[in-house]
Amino acid sequence: MYKRQAKDSPERIAPGKILGQIIKIGFPSACETALYNIAMTLVVRFMNQMDADGLNVTARSYATQIANFSYCIGAALAQANAILTGWHIGAKEYDECDRGTRKAAIYGVITASCLSITFALLGNYIVRIFTNDVQMINLVTKLLAIDIVLEFGRVTNLVYGQALKTSGDAVFPVVMGAVFMYLAAVGGTYFFGLHLGLLAVGAYIGLASDECIRAVGMVLRWKSGKWKNKGLVD
């Protein structure tokens, strides 16, 4: 009797269907990660062409290491909000999804911006953890200043992007990434960094542009409400 009720329960989902749902979200997300890694490989390749001593690519490495503290905040909020978003979508509580995602983005942007501004202001001292070279310190400090804008876009991108994936709208972030990671990040690194001669500063302008453009796209997609019709659970 119990087994029959469990089998006929509308809440019971076949393993094959669950696997299909996992692939529906997981495969596009994997593609986005692969596209990002390829894009960053091209960025590093261009930065290696900026000088023979590797000053610019090393400066980016230092700046990235410092900025990762800001990134951790955004990533944590994005993951936490994604879990809550999944719950609310399952309960058809779309207004709660919207409010929660908006709050997570606001808190993330404020926290990441405060950290980024602090790192930029104290960059002259923080970079000395890695090196005492004056030229390197000055360059990394400039990159940390640009990183304020980059983190603003990246946190927004993370929160709204993860929320879209959780809702089942996993293809849109991949399309945005495929277009703008290569146009803005890779193309910007080449144009601003090599063509205009801004070197690592130019590369960071391209990277910041990529994050901010994709962030705007994620927010607009979320506000369009199209994700409400892409839920994995009926």
In which residue ranges do the predicted regions lie?
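Juxtamembrane/interfacial segments around transmembrane helices
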Residues: 7-10, 32-35, 39-40, 74-81, ...
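Transmembrane alpha-helix boundary and packing residues in multipass membrane permease domains
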Residues: 29, 33, 41, 45, ...
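Alpha-helical membrane-inserting segments
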Residues: 35, 39, 43, 47, ...
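Short alpha-helical transmembrane segments in multi-pass integral membrane proteins
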Residues: 3-27, 85-150, 192-234
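Small-residue-rich hydrophobic transmembrane alpha-helices
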Residues: 44, 57-123, 154-177
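Hydrophobic faces of transmembrane alpha-helices in multi-pass small-molecule transporters and flippases
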Residues: 11-42, 65, 69, 73, ...
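Helix-terminus/linker motif at the lipid-water interface of multi-pass membrane proteins
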Residues: 34-65, 69, 87, 125-134, ...
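Short runs within selected transmembrane alpha-helices of multi-pass transporters and secretion channels
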Residues: 74-78, 147-166, 172-184, 188, ...
